[in-house]
């Protein structure tokens, strides 16, 4: 066995080695390369197909293989690659060759003249075949690139060490694949030639001639194919000669300004080339080569070019033009930037012919690939994406050479530069020597440390200093004078002084320096050191830290000494070229020989350390201090800034620019809807101010083409061949999508219609298969919903069709002009020819029929019809004015009040039926009020819609005729009716007589029956079962008996007539058929045990069967009853157990228990679900568990459940202690202090676990002290307090409502539907879906078991909700969960019998979102006409509504419960945009429970539709973040994100008014508790504090911020331009917001959006009308124009719009290249708490009242955000502070955080000394018994080693990331201190 396993293991390892070997992998990839067939194969196939002889075939194959071999070699041999890859070589060689090839006629055999039979290799045509195949194989990679090839070549490159072996093996693999391919081709051709069926000569007689013709034209076919291929590729790649030259920011725009800007700006606008490859001029044609060339040192030797501004200059050129560039060399700070940007004045004077020819023809910086230009609209250029994120280099570590991926790029760069310019004479030590050296140095360090420690210990013991200090022998000059040599040159002195220099004044270091002359120093260093070190490494930015120049000079001096000492030969070589007169013999190293004067030394240093900058304005020379330049990595950027057409239009508005835009954006047309000329400024209603501009302002809408946008922001002139593979599955989609994310996209698109249609088809089939009729009838609401869905689908389909037609018109050339002219023609025809002629004809006809003519009415209607010209998408302009460019852009003609010809005008009233609904009439009227004209003269509802049905002219006439005929008939047939009645009477008489006869016969038969007793069986009644009887037979199983007995009779015994026999036989057959039918149905049906329908009549006298049936029925009833009552039995059983245990365990009197239970009555009420089970259409299977507390409550307080039919599903596993105490922890402490005695008992309980008891104690849930003291509700545990400060965790109800799909939410709502919709105050304290033990009883029907992908969303949302609920449950009673709805309490007071504190009616902590408090304990009156099932409110609109003081809420509400106008005071805090107010409980009148939330009854239309489709909630980028931004964005350092101009000027006044208000409240309310008073005071203080802290309250500060943050040059230009115009504050503000933060898109809510657009369409028309009253009134009546939207005043500031909810800030996905710091910031961001949250945290933590004066003293401490009071400790992020949310982990973590000792959790009393206010110490469990410093160090050291498991399990969405790969916590090696200034 051992041997076998050993052999097997060896075999496996051998196989693995073989598979992973370079040769095998090379073969594999080479074989794969075969499949990327390119155009080069055309020549190879041509040689085979044409049958030109084996020689040509051989030469073609040889050329093909040679070309491929060259390609493989060129991948690894840089010179060959550069030669092939340069754009100009390819262009120069390829274009002439292609032309020659295509226009060389094949039948003129140019190359055959030299052919001899001796040697066919001399035949030029064969050589040409070889050349063709060779060259096209090269084209296959460079000119006709295939992305597959490029990627395949790159795959294995970094892993293989032996590169040539890999190249060889991959070539061999390619060869094998190629041979196989050619064999296959040969077989196919042979089969074609041999197969007779191919050349069937049924119809073609001259078959031979056809084949020969085909063979002759084959060459032409191949040439055409090749030509098409090349044209296809070359059409997509820009021609290098006519490449669109993109404007660089550096050349023109930056010119004069950039030197004024700060360092930051120059860095950001600079263009950095990513790799040396690009600097060498190779194009980005082939991405497969970038990576390899970075490593290749040979490539650097190819050329010595240095690019300045795109011009290639060799080294000699630089020496020639040295005076021109001298300044840039001296520029210490900007030298690299100047090399990149080329901001050189002299450039502009150079003539064009001085530029090299190649640079003119080929712009190496052009966008050859379809790289997407990622815009960053603030100030940066386009990002290049060729740079790696890490920098790899070898470095010694622990004595060994290892590859480091975090190597400092500066070191590597410096080394490379030095090695490039001068060969270092040092030899590399062997690895063993390195390792030994490292060990030796380590030993030395240890010895030194030990020696130092020993000496210190000796000092501590009190030994003499002279004995302890080290004694050294020194070298001195003179014995008598005791003058020593300097330490640096003392050979006897070793140790710390040896080889180091003391930093002191430069004048004192005369002896340390070297002694060349001033001239030579200057020339060497200026001309050569810069030449060595300043090669253009553009991928590094320079961060400059200023240092003291004095101390710096000594360092530089010493480094000069060292460098010159080591590299004299190299310097002499380079210096000799430029300065031959320099004498190097004068240089010496010994200080005694020659010394330079200190002033000369200073000058030398000054040349290095100072830069002489020519100021662009005054041309003066100024000195700037140099800094140590730390070379750091930066994002590589392109050198130009590209604009799209929208930006171009913006620039055109601001200044006339001749430049064309470079980025292709979506097809759009600018539709001008209104032109504001100077003369009609009075009627101007546009939102723009009319400035004194020369040209008229145009109001325009942008109309996007509905086609899919495949231009994808491509740059003009870039290549399209290698776009990402994209698919489209919709007729029109805005952007292309990758198929990877199909599962994330809403499945309503046509692409997915197939599988969904299948589901729709399957549902009814399944239902029919399972049961004939459904078990429960669907409710009306479901039917309505289904109809609505159908209607919406139909509308969507119609809309798609309309869009499709519109796009067809838009794409065909000249189609718009044709259509427009046809429309205008049809309009003229209709208005002036067709309708007048119809009116004339009608009235003449009326006169001929002796009716009154209706000239007046008809002409009035005809005059009223208006034909209004509209833009292509339907914006109305006017009757006479045509849209601008309507022949190209398109036109619509809208007919207002379309005239409809009727036979008579008074028929309208007659035709209207009495039962017709006025609403439907209104709708009809709306529809008929306008229409659009089609090109055929028809009417349609919407542009491009289907023509609507015209009301027929003759229909009313026919109806009228029918009425007349009916009347005639009525009179004519009256006689017949009388006749019919007579005949009826006669028949009735005869029937009665017949009855008497029948009865008489029956009586005789009865007498006869008495004679024959057996006939009892014969005349038994057999009833035909009715519908109910059928059901009875199903359930009672008795139906089998009677037919059997009937069937077993002996019919011959009876003397009955033949007729009766037939009747009985018929009855038997019918019964038998019914039985069979019923048994079949039984097999199909699901039995329903509780259907209990009694039969009409039992058709049998058998007593035994009857008793059996009776027993069966009784047992069935009993079992149903048992099933129904089982939960009650279980519940009572559990009650008993729990009551006994509770009463035994908690040793307090029963009275106390009763008090406890009564005091918790309010909380428990919520879990009692008083609803009936048999509500129609509601699936009751998902009812939740009733908590055991409610069972105790029922047994002790004798309360009855109001409805006995309630079904309860109970599960014992749910009632664990952890769960019980989890539930108890939600109850306010205030009500639970009586449990204190249980928790105060410090010994072990039989029942209560110590851990849970400790947890409750530390949480402050139970107060162990007496009930008369103040409860500890205000104190909180530290970790929870910390979490409370982060907006990520305070998710509002709106968010939870969006978590899961709408269908599922509807199901929840249905289940919670309130039965009594008519009662005004109905109880909505429904049972809450419990997340810890959620038993979702799935519906058993097969329909609902269809797989749904949305289950995952539900699961995620449950975890999120559980964590959210667990973290913030102390905000109120129960925060919003899962499906928890707006809870509306019945209008009654909750009893407080035992002097407990009543909760205040409105208690909202400042700065916490008000939407968190919805649905907790506040009472809402909702009007009864509104839909009571609508439980979700979208706060996106209402969020900013109440910003002004004294807003009267009453106009918003439409209530019948009385008017209460509350005065709302609101703080205008810059960051916290939440509602903050106090409503006095005693001031309201009899309706005192009617609360602030009344205004939620407003405007249902606005609220009913959610803002956007948020099903994939887990993409934070796509979600409407109004919830995140409505409160201050605490973890986002960009403070200016939501700045408002002039918004906070009156903040002090407001604070004063608020103070007055609060004091007023105090005076009015005589019943304010101490709690309330404390809250009011704290509230007041917080407001003052925020008012003082508010940095945005001063407009000057804001101006300063703006000027600091505007750094981009183009933005600066715009700003300078803006200064010329005097703009209003609002415009400045809007410009500022939009221009600076363009990655936020502003949009408004959909319903509002639609209404505003409708209004705009009407305005456009009204503005042009002379008398607009009639149209305006009719449009308001039709509901086209909305008055509430019109109420917006003229010049609205953006802030006002945002406050009113008209604009919503919706962040777009930032186009920024994420890097390490961003991920670190994402991860650690939640630890950064903004200062405005400190007071909330403090308010929750503190226990005592604090005087206001101390606050005023302590506000200065809030300047630093994360610094503690004493400013010594910094708050660090400890992941163990964040609790994990899966399963029961929260308990374990809590217990490990808070030990059982109650003293550890400190409530942090605030010290009354103002200097020591603890403003941000919430991360540590601080205590007076605990040393915080040690604790901090301990945690800092320890935490990475544990809690990682919990960290990994944490819900990753809490970190604001959208996939797990960004969870980069483990990348961070060290956690620095975080301070946000």
Swiss-Prot record:
Composition bias type Basic and acidic residues, residue spans: 685-695
Function field: Involved in protein precursor import into chloroplasts. May be part of an intermediate translocation complex acting as a protein-conducting channel at the inner envelope.
Topology term for the membrane: Multi-pass membrane protein
Miscellaneous comment in the UniProt entry for this protein: There is a partial copy of the N-terminus (positions 1-454) of ycf1 in the inverted repeat (ABQ43318).
Protein name per UniProt: Protein TIC 214
GO biological process entries: protein transport
Originating organism: Chloranthus spicatus (Chulantree)
Biased composition annotated in UniProt, kind: Acidic residues: 251-268, 281-304, 645-659
Subcellular location: Plastid, Chloroplast inner membrane
Primary site of residence: plastid
Summary of subunit composition and partner proteins: Part of the Tic complex.
Ranges where the record places region Disordered: 246-313, 644-695, 774-795
Family: Belongs to the TIC214 family.
A GO CC term assigned to this protein in UniProt: chloroplast inner membrane
InterPro entries found in the cross-reference section: TIC214
4Fe-4S as UniProt keyword: no
Record key words, sorted: Chloroplast, Membrane, Plastid, Plastid inner membrane, Protein transport, Transmembrane, Transmembrane helix, Transport
Taxonomic path: Eukaryota, Viridiplantae, Streptophyta, Embryophyta, Tracheophyta
Spans traversing the lipid bilayer: 18-38, 64-84, 87-107, 124-144, 172-192, 221-241
């Amino acid at each position: 066995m051992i041997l076998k396993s050993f052999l097997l293991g060896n075999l496996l390892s051998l196989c693995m080695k073989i598979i992973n070997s370079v040769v095998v992998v090379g073969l594999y990839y080479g074989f794969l390369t075969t499949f990327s067939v390119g155009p080069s194969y055309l020549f190879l196939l041509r040689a085979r197909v044409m049958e030109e002889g084996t020689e040509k075939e051989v030469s073609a194959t040889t050329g093909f293989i040679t070309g491929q071999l060259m390609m493989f070699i060129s991948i690894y041999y840089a010179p060959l690659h550069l030669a092939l890859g340069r754009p100009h070589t390819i262009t120069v060689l390829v274009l002439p060759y292609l032309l020659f090839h295509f226009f060389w006629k094949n039948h003129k055999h140019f190359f055959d003249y030299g052919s001899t039979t001796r040697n066919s290799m001399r035949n030029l045509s064969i050589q040409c075949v070889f050349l063709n195949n060779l060259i096209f194989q090269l084209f296959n990679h460079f000119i006709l690139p295939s992305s597959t090839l490029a990627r395949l070549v790159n795959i294995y490159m970094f892993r293989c060490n032996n590169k040539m072996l890999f190249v060889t093996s991959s070539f061999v693999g390619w060869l094998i694949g190629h041979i196989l391919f050619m064999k296959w081709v040969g077989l196919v051709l042979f089969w074609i030639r041999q197969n007779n069926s191919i050349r069937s000569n049924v119809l073609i007689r001259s078959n031979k001639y056809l084949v020969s013709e085909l063979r002759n034209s084959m060459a032409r076919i191949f040439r055409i194919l090749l030509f098409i291929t090349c044209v296809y590729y070359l059409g997509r790649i820009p021609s290098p000669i006519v490449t669109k030259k993109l404007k660089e920011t550096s050349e023109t725009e930056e010119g004069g300004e950039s030197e004024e800007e700060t360092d930051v700006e120059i860095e950001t606008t600079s263009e950095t080339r990513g790799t040396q490859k690009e600097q060498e001029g190779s194009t980005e044609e082939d991405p497969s080569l970038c990576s390899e060339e970075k490593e290749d040192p040979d490539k650097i030797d190819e050329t010595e070019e240095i690019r300045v501004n795109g011009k290639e200059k060799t080294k000699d050129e630089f020496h020639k033009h040295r005076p021109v560039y001298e300044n840039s060399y001296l520029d210490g700070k900007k030298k690299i930037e100047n090399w990149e940007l080329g901001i050189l004045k002299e450039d502009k004077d150079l003539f064009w012919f001085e530029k090299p020819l190649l640079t003119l023809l080929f712009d190496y910086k052009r966008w050859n690939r379809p790289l997407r230009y990622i815009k960053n609209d603030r100030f940066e250029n386009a990002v290049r994406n060729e740079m790696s994120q890490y920098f790899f280099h070898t470095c010694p570590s622990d004595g060994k050479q290892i590859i480091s991926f975090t190597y400092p790029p500066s070191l590597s760069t410096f080394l490379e530069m030095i090695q490039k310019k001068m060969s270092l004479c040092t030899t590399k030590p062997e690895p063993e020597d390195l390792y030994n050296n490292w060990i030796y140095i380590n030993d030395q360090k240890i010895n030194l440390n030990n020696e130092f420690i020993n000496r210190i210990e000796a000092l501590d013991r009190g030994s003499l200093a002279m004995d302890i200090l080290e004694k050294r022998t020194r070298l001195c000059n003179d014995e008598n004078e005791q003058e020593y040599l300097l330490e640096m040159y003392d050979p006897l002195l070793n140790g710390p002084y040896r080889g180091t220099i003391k930093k002191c004044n430069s004048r004192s270091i005369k002896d340390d320096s070297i002694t060349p002359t001033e001239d030579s120093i200057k020339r060497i260093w200026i001309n050569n050191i810069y030449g060595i070190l300043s090669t253009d490494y553009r991928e590094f930015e320079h961060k400059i830290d200023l240092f003291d120049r004095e101390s710096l000079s000594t360092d530089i001096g010493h480094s000069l000494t060292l460098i010159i000492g080591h590299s004299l030969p190299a310097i002499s070589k380079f210096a000799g070229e430029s300065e031959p007169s320099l004498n190097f013999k004068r240089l010496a190293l010994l200080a005694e020989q020659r010394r330079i004067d200190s002033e000369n030394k200073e000058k030398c240093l000054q040349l290095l350390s100072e830069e002489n900058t020519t100021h662009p304005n005054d041309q003066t020379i100024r000195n700037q201090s140099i800094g140590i330049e730390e070379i750091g990595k930066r994002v590589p950027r392109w050198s130009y800034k590209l604009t799209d057409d929208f930006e171009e239009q913006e620039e055109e508005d601001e200044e006339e620019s001749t430049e064309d835009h470079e980025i292709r954006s979506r097809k759009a047309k600018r539709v001008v809807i209104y032109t504001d000329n100077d003369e009609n400024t009075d009627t101007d209603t546009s939102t723009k101010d009319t400035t004194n501009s020369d040209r008229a302002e145009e109001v325009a809408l942008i109309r996007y083409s509905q086609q899919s946008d495949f231009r994808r922001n491509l740059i003009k002139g870039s290549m399209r061949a290698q776009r990402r593979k994209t698919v489209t599955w919709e007729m029109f989609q805005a952007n292309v999508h990758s198929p990877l994310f199909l599962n994330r996209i809403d499945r309503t698109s046509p692409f997915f219609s197939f599988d969904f249609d299948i589901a729709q088809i399957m549902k009814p089939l399944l239902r029919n298969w399972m049961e004939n009729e459904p078990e429960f009838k669907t409710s009306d609401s479901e039917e309505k919903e289904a109809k609505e869905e159908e209607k919406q689908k139909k509308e969507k389909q119609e809309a798609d069709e309309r869009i499709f037609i519109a796009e067809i018109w838009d794409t065909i050339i000249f189609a718009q002009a044709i259509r427009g002219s046809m429309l205008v023609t049809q309009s003229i025809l209709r208005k002036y020819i067709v309708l007048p002629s119809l009116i004339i004809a009608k009235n003449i006809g009326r006169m001929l029929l002796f009716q009154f003519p209706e000239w007046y009415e008809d002409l009035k209607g005809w005059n009223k019809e208006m034909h209004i010209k509209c833009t292509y998408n339907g914006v109305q302009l006017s009757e006479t004015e045509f849209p601008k460019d309507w022949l190209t852009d398109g036109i619509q003609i809208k007919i207002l009040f379309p005239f409809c010809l009727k036979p008579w005008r008074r028929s309208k009233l007659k035709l209207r039926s009495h039962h017709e609904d006025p609403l439907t009439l209104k709708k009809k009227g709306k529809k008929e009020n306008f229409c659009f004209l089609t090109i055929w003269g028809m009417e349609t509802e919407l542009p491009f819609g289907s023509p609507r049905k015209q009301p027929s002219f003759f229909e009313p006439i026919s109806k009228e005729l029918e009425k007349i005929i009916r009347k005639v008939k009525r009179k004519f047939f009256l006689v017949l009716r009388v006749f019919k009645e007579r005949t009826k009477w006669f028949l009735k008489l005869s029937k009665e007589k017949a009855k008497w006869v029948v009865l008489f016969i029956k009586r005789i038969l009865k007498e006869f029956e008495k004679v024959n007793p057996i006939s009892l069986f014969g005349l038994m009644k057999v009833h035909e079962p009715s519908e109910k009887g059928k059901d009875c037979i199903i359930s009672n199983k008795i139906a089998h008996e009677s037919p059997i007995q009937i069937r077993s009779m002996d019919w011959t015994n009876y003397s009955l007539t033949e007729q009766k026999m037939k009747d009985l036989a018929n009855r038997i057959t019918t019964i038998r058929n019914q039985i069979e039918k019923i048994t079949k149905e039984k097999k199909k049906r699901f039995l329903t045990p509780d259907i209990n329908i009694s039969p009409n009549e039992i058709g049998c006298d058998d007593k035994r069967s009857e008793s059996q049936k009776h027993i069966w029925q009784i047992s069935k009833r009993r079992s149903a009853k048992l099933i129904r009552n089982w939960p009650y039995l279980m519940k009572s059983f559990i009650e008993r157990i729990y009551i006994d245990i509770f009463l035994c365990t908690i040793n307090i009197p029963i009275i106390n228990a009763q008090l406890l239970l009564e005091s918790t009555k309010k909380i428990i009420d919520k879990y009692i679900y008083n609803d009936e089970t048999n509500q129609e259409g509601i699936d009751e299977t998902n009812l939740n568990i009733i908590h055991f507390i409610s069972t105790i409550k029922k047994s002790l307080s004798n309360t009855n459940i109001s409805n006995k039919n309630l079904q309860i599903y109970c599960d014992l596993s749910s009632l664990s202690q952890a769960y019980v105490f989890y539930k108890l922890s939600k109850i306010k402490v205030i009500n639970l202090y009586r449990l204190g005695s249980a928790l105060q008992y410090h010994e072990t309980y039989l029942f209560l676990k110590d851990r849970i008891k400790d947890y409750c104690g530390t949480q402050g849930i139970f107060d162990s002290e007496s009930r008369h003291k103040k409860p500890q509700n205000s104190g909180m545990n530290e970790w929870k307090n910390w979490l409370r400060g982060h907006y990520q965790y305070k998710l509002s109800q709106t968010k939870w409502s969006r978590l899961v799909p709408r269908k599922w939410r509807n199901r929840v709502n249905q289940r919670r539907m309130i039965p009594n919709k008519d009662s005004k105050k109905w109880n909505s304290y429904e049972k809450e879906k419990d997340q810890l033990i959620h038993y979702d009883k799935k519906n058993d029907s097969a329909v609902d078991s269809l797989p749904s992908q949305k289950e995952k969303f539900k699961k995620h949302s449950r975890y999120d909700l559980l964590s959210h609920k667990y973290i913030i449950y102390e905000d109120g009673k129960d925060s919003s969960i899962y499906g928890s709805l707006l809870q509306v309490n019945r209008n009654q007071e909750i009893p407080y019998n035992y002097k407990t504190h009543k909760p205040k009616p409105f208690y909202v902590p400042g700065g916490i979102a008000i939407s968190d408090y919805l649905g907790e304990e506040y009472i809402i009156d909702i009007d009864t006409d509104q839909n009571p099932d609508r439980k979700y409110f979208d706060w996106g609109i209402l969020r900013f509504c109440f910003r002004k003081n004294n807003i009267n809420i009453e106009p918003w509400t439409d209530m019948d419960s009385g008017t209460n106008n509350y005065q709302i005071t609101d703080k205008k805090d810059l960051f916290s945009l939440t509602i903050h107010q106090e409503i006095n409980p005693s001031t309201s009148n009899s309706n005192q429970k009617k609360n602030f939330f009344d205004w939620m009854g407003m405007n249902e239309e606005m609220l009913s539709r959610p803002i956007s489709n948020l099903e994939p909630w887990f993409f934070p980028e796509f979600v409407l973040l109004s919830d995140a931004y409505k409160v201050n964005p605490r973890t986002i350092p960009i403070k200016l994100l939501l700045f408002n101009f002039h918004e906070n000027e009156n903040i002090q006044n407001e604070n004063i008014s608020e103070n007055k208000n609060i004091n007023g409240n105090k005076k009015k309310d005589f019943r304010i508790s101490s709690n309330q008073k404390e809250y009011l005071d704290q509230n007041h203080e917080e407001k003052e504090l925020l008012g003082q802290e508010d940095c945005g309250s001063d407009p000057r500060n804001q101006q300063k911020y703006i000027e600091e943050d505007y750094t981009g040059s183009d933005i600066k230009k715009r700003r300078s331009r803006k200064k010329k115009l005097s703009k209003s504050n609002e415009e400045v503000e809007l410009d500022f917001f939009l221009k600076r933060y363009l990655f936020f898109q502003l949009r408004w809510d959909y319903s509002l959006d639609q209404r505003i657009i409708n209004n705009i369409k009407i305005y456009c028309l009204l503005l042009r009308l002379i008398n607009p009253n009639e149209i305006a009134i009719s449009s308001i009546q039709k509901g086209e124009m909305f008055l509430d939207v019109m109420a917006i005043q003229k010049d609205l500031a953006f802030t006002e719009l945002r406050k009113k909810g008209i604009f919503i800030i919706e962040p777009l996905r930032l186009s920024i290249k994420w890097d390490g710091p961003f991920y670190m910031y994402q991860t650690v961001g939640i630890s950064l708490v903004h200062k405005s949250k400190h007071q909330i945290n403090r308010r929750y933590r503190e226990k005592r009242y604090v005087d206001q004066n101390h606050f005023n003293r302590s506000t200065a401490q809030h300047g630093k955000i994360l610094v503690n009071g004493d400013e010594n400790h910094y708050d660090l992020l400890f992941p163990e502070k964040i609790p994990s949310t899966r399963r029961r982990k929260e308990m374990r973590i809590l217990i490990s955080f808070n030990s059982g000792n109650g003293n550890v959790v400190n409530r942090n009393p605030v010290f009354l000394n103002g200097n020591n206010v603890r403003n941000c110490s919430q991360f540590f469990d601080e205590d007076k018994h605990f040393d915080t410093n040690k604790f901090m160090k301990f945690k800092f050291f320890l935490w990475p080693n544990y809690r990682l498991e919990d960290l990994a399990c944490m819900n990753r969405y809490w970190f604001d990331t959208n996939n797990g790969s960004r969870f980069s916590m483990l990348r961070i090696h060290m956690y620095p201190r975080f301070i946000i200034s």
